[in-house]
């Protein structure tokens, strides 16, 4: 049992109120002006924000098969440090969770080693990236969170349509990395001014937006919940906005780096700036910010994609796609958008908690009496510099190295257990 003393919580109007929070048996038992108990442990939250633990539906944990990049343990330690209490792990592992047996083995490993809640995706196709569909029903029974071939787009419309019909019958979501392989052209960055300046092959906007346009029509026909991963282009935002207006059940996420950076920020041919989707144009970034504010884009997800140093500290042509994000998500977004008065604190917290929970019908993301005690304590005055040497993640690959941010998680409770406190994993 814990009593979080002298903290602040956000009320429904987005105003800060001074409150104590009592955690008992893994639940939020009481939220009150003052709580006095004779047993349990007192946690000093003076001057700090007590918020729901963050939810990230797009995380690469790499295990099994990629343990040199990340493990379930190190990835969930990174999540705890970043204030995330629920993360959803992508299936581009070896082996791929494309069968009941592999999924059950993965669930057992998660139960054994994870510091926070991990909800694993199953792949849409066998081995991921093929045209043979998995056994959707068996994988749901084995505990799959949803279905995705993240890392590649499902290339054939017929394959995607059949997948959507099967997912809809089970009331499960299809989560899509949207990329038409015939439009990538071997690109490593956005097809724009940086690619032209550096003489690099570019990935055009239409590689993403064309597949989203196809898929929203398939989702409408199948009656499926279709979720767009890491949306990055103005055309994609337009397609999703129009689909929502038409009543199609489509949701979308955006990554912090696509909100903060664009291609003009890239300093040179450095693999640590290579990600998929790539950093787009200023106009694309503006469209993403507008789409998030008007509800076209539903929430924020990091697309935490750790790699070994030798896979990133090379030119873009040789580097792996992806950057880490779990340990920097909140500080970056708070510094760039809340401190600058572009967003309210409540908007940011909602996009990292209740919004993803609502989209995927998760019973998390709220701080209220009776809720699961997934809690992050945030010091909104704490100033620190992003230093990959301090990361719990094995991946140190971030373009934000050396950036000073204000507002950091200082403690994380997962189902009432203190898993991170003042720089230490418990």
Curated annotation (Swiss-Prot):
Pfam families: Amidohydro_1 (PF01979). Gene3D superfamilies: Metal-dependent hydrolases (3.20.20.140), Urease, subunit C, domain 1 (2.30.40.10). The active site is at residue 303. Keywords: Hydrolase, Metal-binding, Pyrimidine biosynthesis, Zinc. InterPro entries: Amidohydro-rel, DHOase, DHOase/Allantoinase_Hydrolase, Dihydroorotase_CS, Metal-dep_hydrolase_composite, Metal_Hydrolase. Zn(2+) 1 binds at residues 58, 60, 150, 303. It is an enzyme of class 3 (hydrolase). Its cofactor is Zn(2+). Zn(2+) 2 binds at residues 150, 177, 230. It comes from the Bacteria. Pathway: Pyrimidine metabolism; UMP biosynthesis via de novo pathway; (S)-dihydroorotate from bicarbonate: step 3/3. The keyword Metal-binding applies. Substrate binds at residues 60-62, 92, 276, 307, 321-322. One of its GO terms (molecular function) is allantoinase activity. PANTHER family: ALLANTOINASE. This is Dihydroorotase. It comes from Listeria monocytogenes serotype 4a (strain HCC23). The gene is pyrC.
